[in-house]
Amino acid sequence: MAGSMKDIKLRIKSVESTMQITKAMELVASSKMRRAKERVEHSRPYFETLHETLTKIAAADPRARNPYLRRDEIKRTLFIVIAGDRGLAGGYNSNVLKQAGAEEGEVVVLPIGKRSAEYFVHHEVPLFTQEVLLAAEISVGECFQLSRQITEGYRKGEYDAVKICYTRFDSMMTQTATTMEVLPLSIEPTEQQKAEARRSQILYKPSSEEVFSAIIPEYVAGIVYGAVCESVASELAARRTAMDAATKNAGEMIDHLNLYYNRARQAAITQEITEIVAGAEI
């Protein structure tokens, strides 16, 4: 019985130690969430403004033949996949990698996030770069550099389409693995936008097509950076939720173990009293 009580006591200490770690990770994730949410909120208007600008340019010259708008047969796709740099975030990594794994056809992958790189190296998928890009540390400048490489490869015909797979941050409790088509652009101006473009006095120099092409790298960089911001916020929210659940489970386990310990201790005391009484009667 003494051995059993000692084992229970050791297990209680082990669970308490684990609970301290999960609680600390929950607090760290919570403290980083405010900044991550601000980045998401600030990145969305940039993308929306660029998309609106491109739509206006396309509406002003609907006959323009731009390589970023063409719809040739898609034989090879560049797939940008954003996952986390660490685990302990519930189903965050597995959900986005499962979403990416559903992509059909020939692909070359640009992984962002350590877990994304490890996954595609393990599955021997052709990679756009051998450099491991950490999702939590990638900067705006690096996104612009990637954008230039991506658009250059697209113009050269190294791939016929560009897609991005990331986790959209809906709320603290909801994050959704999403695939978005980046290139070629899906821009269909409405009749109202076309009418407004005809009435507009805007002149594009040297030409609307060249201005359109010049904006594309900015647009792609905005998508990549925005998707990274959304994914980082989603990872932190998922980790906070997972660590909160783990902390609560650890607390419940400690309560149960304390109950078992008290029962074992009571049984040991009862046995000692019984033995003393039996010895006295003899």
Give names to the regions the model predicted.
Residues 1-282:
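C-terminal beta-strand-loop-alpha-helix "lid" module of Rossmann-like NAD(P)-dependent dehydrogenases
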